[in-house]
Amino acid sequence: MRKEERYQRILAHFRKEMPNVNTELEFGSVFQLLVAVILSAQCTDKRINQVTPELFSHYPDAKTMAKAEPEDVLEYIRSVSYPNAKAEHLVKMARALVERHDGEVPSDMNQLLDLPGVGRKTANVIQSVAFGKSALAVDTHVYRVAHRLGLVSKRDNTPYKVEMALTKYIPEADVPDAHHWLLLHGRYVCTSRKPHCEKCELKALCPKLLEDSKLA
């Protein structure tokens, strides 16, 4: 199957099955989204949504969090992964926002990447979800599903390479949704250790499943 046809059929499926898709993180502002995304690294959205309400009740914006110390923030995020490092990142990020952007989260990629604790994946989520830009964040779910569905090649062995490969074929209008489509498919169907192939409606297009069946 040609690469273009594979993309067309897979994207058509996702458009039909998930027409109104969005992040599962809960937030009330762009700053709160940024905090939630930073916290979500190596952690589930469910866990993040459990800790952010109390965190945001004390630190609803960059200016209030910038006045805190990492140990203050740590009290509210102890149950997430790497809490000490994340508390440090959050306070430094908030202070940088206040110093450089009057407490507002910028939409520019380079300005986002200059913030403490913000990498390309996080910056892409902010650009896409908060500002509606054509940006595709590649997390572990997106990376795994893209490879299993044959959307990218084995040579695309870094998140950046996967991002570039995906955005080469995905129509610009679909790019923001494509992140959520692939992520949610990876989170609930094409899971890491025991993928639910029996209920996957894309199994006819899955080279990974075909390869596994030949080895059986």
Regions from the PLM with identified roles:
Residues 2-215:
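Catalytic cores of DNA base-excision repair glycosylases
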